[in-house]
A protein has these predicted regions:
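Acidic, proline/glycine-enriched N-terminal capping motif
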Residues: 388-528, 533
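Flavin-dependent oxidoreductases
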Residues: 21, 179-295, 304-312, 396-418, ...
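Glycine-rich FAD pyrophosphate-binding loop
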Residues: 27-48
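Dinucleotide-binding Rossmann-like beta1-alpha1 core, especially the glycine-rich loop
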Residues: 52-130, 257-262, 268, 296, ...
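C-terminal catalytic lobe of FAD-dependent flavoproteins
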Residues: 257, 288-425
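Beta1/beta-strand and adjacent pyrophosphate-binding region of the FAD-binding site
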Residues: 4-18, 35
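Conserved, structured C-terminal
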Residues: 415-442, 449-451, 467, 543-550, ...
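Flavin (FAD/FMN) cofactor-binding and adjacent substrate-gating region
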Residues: 76, 80, 97-167, 172-173, ...
Length: 859
């Protein structure tokens, strides 16, 4: 056994397929002073007993892109390492047994267009030609993926490790990392029974033991292992002709309705399922002496799935069972991997919860290596970033959500579906009031948020669908109430970041791409990474203490990105101080979370409501008192103001694109403010509205949103935010914010693509040019996001979000297309957007549908 080095640039803990992939990709990126530590043998844990299935399809196109990379990598990996990965690209048939699942397949097929995937919608008869032992009457259609197949999990892992060793990395087996400690100088000591390695970075790829490794560093990762079973049949002579005709390996199939997957294996068949009666494994901690063991099978749990298999694939009914494999795999609450840097612990990285390691491991490894070596993952990994989870993901929460996710692994996720497990968790003080108003609830970053308000006497439930739901007419009423009078929405779910201290303005001037406003003003401010890509869109507000003039900065942004942005802010504060930008105490940063509650009123009568509750204020408060006229309280002003007896921070801004105000108060005072505003608004017909109506109104204005239009793969010039990027200070000197040079270069070169708003036909008259010859999916439906945009008979872009703009009475979409197609000189009506498999005519809108001059918002 080779001696253990005393130091390394990076240590990877865990020798499963993910750890080996991270090591391999680090060496490809030039970090060869890298060590992988494996407690036992490579693949011990989950990898060794995996079924080895791989495919490129995923509900998140960004994850699908990484899966495609993984599958494409295997051929080169075999050549590079000399180790066989056991790749069998048999192709895979995805089967739908009802209209909803067929809609999902249409969406998956359409999304694959702009990713370059070669899927094909096929009939049931065509599916039966590929899987001759299925019963056609149980299905309505299918999707053919020629790239699906399976690999040898052990071969893949050893190929990664071998190639990494050939590049200079080290792999140490039978070396247990039983402690990880951060030193005062910021380096990490990885303590093993064979010695201690000091490193700059370490990566937790612990798999089944990732929780234990995280706890060594004081964090609780939101992952849990679940028992997962699949069975192998005896040889089945009847399938021999099929095997011979397909090169000996058959063709894989996924039966979404039956919640089963199947493929050929050793002259027989393999059948796996994600059963409803799922069972967590080792809930509190994973035993360190667990290794290459299997768990006791429980066929009774599989009985419902087997009954479906016998009906849909009768050949299983007479097949003998050779072996039942039951082994643990780790899952995150939403089923996606958990990767990236750990907030507040520089040099600590995680790559765990990758339950589909043979499909996703390569992409995860590449993203991690890019991130660690260059500061950016190189892909849009928002859906996998560890920062998407906050401190609210306790072990009990994780258990409930993981079990829910596992049991729904092959279930359809509808775009308007809100899953009930572990809810409600966090609620605001007015939760009961909104609930009494018949709110239909969603959840965002652990907080319950009102989506819309059902009519009195009706159940507050939204029908899940890919089409327009029972919320449609009610949301229209909410929008009408706002546009013609006044509405109130809770905004507690927005992220609130507070900065104080003598160095706070200088820090924000470096972190945000727009100029920091003067006291009493607000500004829209993108945040960029070093490559000039968008990593945040904020409203930054400056408040000055009326006595000593000390400034407080509120940076308001997307609630779901609170942890993501907190991590970046803390990293930049540390870098700012290290670069001589001040000393400890010069910048005080605090994410306010639910300490500060929010209510927003919007609509042409919003000023009247605010005037009715605004109290005369002493000059020492710095506010204008009860004068809320445009002259005294202009667009993007912010001030401290007493609303009745409630001291509040009020900003004149709203995401509705209308006249409006955001009111921020301590959480303990939210109920009183809510009652006050509702009472004052009664003469004006004030109505509660939710996020569905807010979304509808943003389409009126063409406002983009975080995680849809604004993501780390776009630049300000592409996304329409370039006007909020200030390259110079007010005195004309160059600013020095992060990403400035890249943003300046992008502005000079001009964007290659642009964000546009489109309107589509009414959604009830499909054109009939769907791939599978049907038209029913086009009825009463809107763009959801990730649909391909056609121009000139080719796919040129993709939709980022969509819905119905009720005030403008238009089905809308936002999306990115080449700059030439976005040019006003290009005919605006030459587009199509593929909605549920139907290409619908779309018109580019170069001006907002509502209030194009902004007079309602600014007046």
């Amino acid at each position: 056994m080779a001696d253990l080095p005393e130091s390394a640039q990076v240590v990877v803990i865990g020798g499963g397929v993910v750890g080996a992939s991270v090591l391999y990709h680090l060496t490809k990126a030039g970090w060869t002073d890298a060590i992988l530590l494996e407690r036992r043998e490579l693949t011990a844990g989950s990898t060794w007993h995996a079924a080895g299935g791989m495919h490129t399809l995923n509900g998140d196109p960004n994850v699908a892109a990484l899966q495609r990379y993984t599958v494409q990598l295997y051929e080169d990996l075999e050549k590079e390492s000399g180790v066989s990965c056991g790749v069998h690209l048999t192709g895979e048939v995805m089967l739908a047994d009802d209209a909803d699942r067929m809609d999902w397949l249409r969406m998956a097929h359409a999304r694959g267009r702009y990713l370059g995937m070669e899927t094909e919608l096929i009939s049931v008869a065509e599916a039966a030609e590929k899987i001759p032992f299925l019963v056609e009457e149980h299905f309505v259609g299918a999707l053919w993926d020629p790239v699906g197949g399976h690999v040898d999990p052990s071969g893949v892992t050893h190929a990664y490790a071998t190639a990494a060793r050939m590049a200079g990395a080290q792999v140490h087996r039978n070396t247990w990392a039983h402690d990880v400690v951060q030193r005062p100088d910021g380096l990490w000591d990885v303590v093993t029974e064979r010695g201690t390695i000091t490193c700059e970075h370490f990566v937790n790829c612990g798999g089944l033991w990732a929780r234990e490794v995280g706890r060594m560093c004081g964090i609780e990762l939101p992952i849990l292992a679940m028992e997962h079973m699949y069975l192998l049949t005896e040889e089945i002579p009847e399938i021999r002709p099929w095997l011979d005709a397909t090169g000996g390996y058959g063709i894989g199939a996924v039966d979404f309705g039956g919640e089963i997957y199947t493929r050929a294996e050793a002259g027989g068949l393999l059948l796996g399922t994600y059963e409803q009666a799922c069972v967590p494994w080792s809930e509190r901690e994973t035993p360190w002496d667990f290794g290459s063991q299997l768990l006791a099978p429980d066929l009774e749990r599989l009985a419902p799935s087997l009954a479906v298999a016998f009906e849909h694939f009768p050949i299983y009914a007479d097949a003998g069972i050779r072996q039942v494999i039951n082994g643990p795999f780790t899952f995150a609450p939403d089923g996606n991997p958990v990767i990236g840097p750990v907030r507040g612990q520089r040099g600590h990285w995680v790559a765990c919860g990758v339950m589909a390691g043979l499909s996703q491991g390569g992409g995860v490894g590449l993203s991690m290596a890019n991130w660690m070596t260059s500061g950016d993952p190189g892909f849009d990994v928002w859906g996998m970033d560890v920062a998407r989870f906050g401190d609210w993901t306790t072990p009990s929460y994780t258990r409930a959500k993981v079990m829910e996710n596992y049991s729904r692994r092959f279930s359809i996720s509808f775009p308007n579906e809100e899953l009930p497990a572990a809810r409600p968790l966090h609620t605001s003080p007015i939760y009961d009031r909104l609930d009494d108003a018949n709110a239909v609830w969603g959840s965002s970053y652990g907080l319950e948020t009102a989506l819309w308000f059902q009519q009195d006497g009706a159940e507050p439930i939204e029908d899940v669908t890919y089409h327009r739901s029972n919320a449609f007419d009610v949301v229209a009423e909410e929008v009408h109430a706002v546009r013609t009078g006044v509405g109130l929405i809770e905004t507690t779910g927005f992220a609130k970041h507070q900065f104080t201290g003598p160095g706070a303005r200088a820090l924000l001037d470096r972190v945000l791409a727009n100029r920091i406003p003067a006291p009493g003003r607000m500004a829209l401010a993108p945040m960029l990474n070093h490559d000039g890509k968008l990593i945040g869109d904020f409203t930054v507000a400056t408040l000055a203490d009326p006595f000593d003039g000390a400034e407080t900065f509120l940076v308001l942004g997307s609630g779901v990105a609170e942890g993501y942005h907190e991590r970046w802010f803390r990293e930049q504060i540390a870098s700012h101080l290290a670069d001589g930008g001040g000393c400890d105490g010069d910048v005080n940063y605090r994410p306010l979370g639910t300490e500060l509650a929010g209510l927003s009123i919007a609509g042409p009568k919003a000023r009247d409501v605010l005037a009715a509750v605004a109290s005369p204020t002493s000059p020492s408060s710095g506010g204008t008192g009860s004068d809320v006229s445009t002259d005294a309280f202009a667009f993007r002003d912010i001030q401290r103001m007493d609303l009745g007896m409630v001291p509040a921070i009020v900003g004149r801004i709203t995401f509705t694109g209308d006249l409006g105000y955001e009111c921020w108060v301590p959480t303990s005072l939210q109920q009183r403010l809510f009652d006050l505003l509702m009472e004052a608004g009664e003469p004006y017909g004030i109505r509660l509205f939710g996020l569905r109506a807010l979304d509808s109104m943003r389409f009126d204005k063409g406002f983009g949103g975080w995680a849809s239009e604004f993501r780390p793969i776009y630049t300000p010039a592409e996304s329409g935010l370039d006007s909020f990027v200030a390259l110079t200070s007010s005195d004309g000197s160059d600013r020095n914010f992060i990403g400035r040079d890249a943003a300046a270069a992008a502005r000079a070169a001009g964007p290659e693509r642009r964000l546009c708003t489109f309107t589509l036909d009414d959604g009830g008259t499909p054109t009939g040019n769907s791939d599978d010859g049907t038209t029913e999916s086009g009825t009463a439906s809107d763009v959801l996001g990730d649909e391909p945009i056609w121009h000139g008979g080719e796919v040129v872009g993709w939709a980022t979000s969509g819905g119905y703009a009720h005030w403008s009475q238009a089905s809308c979409a936002m999306g990115y297309v080449p700059a030439a197609a976005a040019d006003p000189a290009t005919p605006p009506d030459a587009f199509e957007i593929e909605v549920l498999g139907v290409r619908r005519p779309a018109t580019r809108r170069d001006e907002p549908l509502f209030d194009p001059t902004g007079i309602r918002m600014r007046g």
